[in-house]
Amino acid sequence: MQYTFAHVDQPLNLLIMLVLGHFLVDFPLQGDKMAVEKCPGKDVTLNWRWWLTAHAATHGFMVAVLTGVPFLGLAEMLVHGLIDFGKCRFGYKLIVDQALHWSCKMIWVACVTVMH
């Protein structure tokens, strides 16, 4: 089953939507508790794996909805989780974290462009 939206025929529009969606999901929808407790050793109310999986899954859902390609949503979930785990483990700066996430969005746009 192929899902399509009006904006996916224009790669720049899709990239803009993915970046806007990223900001929505990564900041206001994440919440302070999840931002802290998704890191190993900082979990208090729930095991960090659940927090990280839930956060990555919201990103995956957003990518699947905006691209119309569920497999890209799964890829986003996995890669986003790995990037955030790396940030927790190695403590790299927010700008590095965000640059990695935005790079993924560019890759997803390239994939959609090739697929269409």
Predicted regions and their residues:
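Transit-peptide-like, low-complexity N-terminal presequences
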Residues: 1-8
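Interhelical loop and helix-boundary elements at the membrane-water interface
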Residues: 8, 18-59, 77, 81-112, ...
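Alpha-helical phosphate/pyrophosphate-handling elements in metalloenzyme active cores
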Residues: 2, 55-65
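Transmembrane helix interruption/hinge and helix-loop junction motifs
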Residues: 63-72, 114-116
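Structural signature of hydrophobic alpha-helical transmembrane segments
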Residues: 10-20, 67-74
